[in-house]
Amino acid sequence: MKILLVFDFDNTIIDDNSDTWIVQCAPNKKLPIELRDSYRKGFWTEFMGRVFKYLGDKGVREHEMKRAVTSLPFTPGMVELFNFIRKNKDKFDCIIISDSNSVFIDWVLEAASFHDIFDKVFTNPAAFNSNGHLTVENYHTHSCNRCPKNLCKKVVLIEFVDKQLQQGVNYTQIVYIGDGGNDVCPVTFLKNDDVAMPRKGYTLQKTLSRMSQNLEPMEYSVVVWSSGVDIISHLQFLIKD
């Protein structure tokens, strides 16, 4: 029986937001005001589609975007964590559920040779079209009013766990490692033995702290981390038996 590790990507695996990082490829490293102002809450993926079109129209090519994305720094201790997981892969399944896109995540994992760590990546599908423009689509449609229109991470997590159960894979625990507001919804799926691991000082940690103070029911335990090394320590504790 294995433990399921669920990772967010932006500000969790990498120490920045890949979507805002790519703006450095724009002329003068900024977007025009009318494009910036076109964002509507809950519709980030559509907004990024317009950003990618703007970059393409300005002549920004795939190799330039790839160079920018692969220069994104890993969060402190994350490389050590992935090496630890690789050595203990018989004890863990790992998935990514991210609001980024498949092209950016592929580039980062490939450049660092970490593809083998992850059994599945759930994110907004992206590809370069015949004009050389990066296009991105919503991962799915859902009815959750807590999450952005393109992705409810809780729905994805439930579907993955159910599918694994149908194939005879039952996890002893789920450990959810994230940072953002859109990680709150999947954390509410966690049960008794599961662990929510919010990054210290980020929205997820602040929200879980507020929920705890309000005495909202939380079956799972909460372990805060600042570095991947903190996560290693807790995983070592979980597998020591």
Curated annotation (Swiss-Prot):
Protein name: Pyridoxal phosphate phosphatase PHOSPHO2
Active site: 8, 10
Organism: Homo sapiens
Any Pfam family: Put_Phosphatase
Cofactor(s) this protein requires: Mg(2+)
Gene3D superfamilies recorded: HAD superfamily/HAD-like
EC number assigned by the record: 3.1.3.74
Binding site for Mg(2+): 8, 10, 179
GO molecular function: metal ion binding; phosphatase activity; pyridoxal phosphatase activity
Residues the record lists as binding substrate: 19, 99
